[in-house]
């Protein structure tokens, strides 16, 4: 659940919130509610604001849902004092407040989450045995390989599609990026609007491309 819009589209969300409440009631400790919220940074004041998170949790509590874990999405690191404040006012354990700050790539997020003990906290709350901390060796090797690939000469790939919103093709872009990692090359994806392509300009539009991919739609 995201804190953004919880009150704005409250009526539309009620059926989903009620389903979560009932599921948590039926499964008890066999279910966890992990609430992802955004902690905005006010540049003028130079501080992070936790009020939106507090209000969001209170909205959930008002419909019978108590988050077990809070993941705070922020652009800057949260101090221990700020995290403790969130834990106190949102009625969760200190160690159940995890920050998710901006990372160089999304693939670093699991490493950052593990470093804060999120995996152990989940296992503990669900009454599951906590073994040795996994080293995540294959994942770390992938990250090392990805960083190394970023230093190589790029391969240019044209992604032809009709949607201007780049996120519409995010899965394709990520797939191409991962393919580049496993081939030790940096892949640069260039979006080409299919509706603006003509017989006259297609040659220039695709000039210098090592490959062309046609997006769905």
Where do the protein language model's features map onto the residues?
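Single conserved hydrophobic/aromatic residue that forms the stacking wall/gate
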Residues: 1-10
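His/Asp/Glu-rich metal-coordinating catalytic cores
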Residues: 12-13, 17-21
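Internal gly/pro-rich beta-alpha loop/helix module
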Residues: 24, 31-130, 139-147
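Glycine- and acidic-residue-enriched helix-capping/strand-helix junction motifs
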Residues: 49-50, 163-180
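A short, charged/proline- and glycine-enriched loop
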Residues: 150-155, 186
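Short beta-strand segments enriched in small/hydrophobic residues
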Residues: 153-163
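Flexible gly/pro-rich beta->alpha loop and the following alpha-helix that scaffold active-site loops
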Residues: 173, 177-217
